[in-house]
Amino acid sequence: MPQKLVYTLQELADLLKVEVQGNTETPISGVEEISEAQAHHITFLDNEKYSRFIKITEAGAIILSKAQAQKYGHLNKNFLVVSEFPSIAFQKCIELFIPPVESGFPGIHPTAVIHPTAHIGKDVCIEPYAVIGQHAHIGDSSYIGAGSIVGAYSILGENCLIHPKVVIRERVEIGKRVIVQPGAVIGSCGFGYITNAFGRHKHLKHLGKVIIEDDVEIGANTTIDRGRFKNSVICEGTKIDNQVQIAHHVEIGKHSMIVAQAGIAGSTKIGNHVIIGGQTGITGHISITDHVIMMAQTGVTKSISSPGIYGGAPARPYQEIHRQVAKIRGLPKLEERLGMLEEKIKGLSVRSEEAQVTP
């Protein structure tokens, strides 16, 4: 999209290919969340939890779905109307008004260390002090950030974005359009040891690969270990947050999401379209079927074979947890009732004793 300082609402609508309701000449020069937006901002409403702001916002325009535009049309405000998912159109506006910051190091920096056997594709950017190992392959239009390492025999597809200080060890295979945030480590050895008769632990070599398919995103300081014999696999479209630990020979299906500080132990298989909440712990050698949602801090100790929402430790269906929480909340009242019953029983006991001693 072309970039300039100010757009009319109609110009934005044409760029986004959406409809306008209201004053098409309204000037827009920035983006802001609905609660803070001023007259020169465009904002959006995606979650109805924030609908209370739509009446009071000073935004120059609001991006809404068709259903929302019908619901709030009486407010006499400027709307950009999309078929669904206002947040997607808003993201395009962000890209218009806040262009990405370039590093200032186009091409291959002279301090980068590239093995002579490595293959570097067309239009690749390699920033200062990055290291590309022997027989590594960097696909066209990919970007390797400052101080990052791509190990020997590793493969990166086209249009990958590897931020600074990423470690991609040897024999890692990464698909197209993969984004890896700073500090991530891909292909480290798994946590596998054998303990001898004297109680000493000896590390086992891990010879498998890590395979990252197309359109995967990996957060900052996340670690993905290679398998001992077989590969660790992250399937296409999966998004992984910061500080996630994925152990050896884990397989994660397509278009799943893993939130920060989750940990998945070795040889576990995760299905497609699974959501793993923050700080969730998943034990090893189990499987989780498709379309499972794990709430934050869930402790998964055995396989999950039915889609649905799970939580607690050990993990159990959300409805069961909800019932248990309701009972726990009722404990103070139950304690009060028990106390009252105890007092009544004591009173009855005293009266009974008095009746027995009365001649």
Swiss-Prot record:
One Gene Ontology cellular component annotation held by this UniProt entry: membrane
Pathway(s) the chain acts in: Bacterial outer membrane biogenesis; LPS lipid A biosynthesis
Record flagged with keyword Acyltransferase: yes
A biological-process GO annotation: lipid A biosynthetic process
General function of this protein: Catalyzes the N-acylation of UDP-3-O-acylglucosamine using 3-hydroxyacyl-ACP as the acyl donor. Is involved in the biosynthesis of lipid A, a phosphorylated glycolipid that anchors the lipopolysaccharide to the outer membrane of the cell.
Xref: HAMAP family: LpxD (MF_00523)
Family: Belongs to the transferase hexapeptide repeat family. LpxD subfamily.
Protein name: UDP-3-O-acylglucosamine N-acyltransferase
Species classification: Bacteria, Pseudomonadati, Chlamydiota, Chlamydiia, Chlamydiales
Gene behind this protein: lpxD
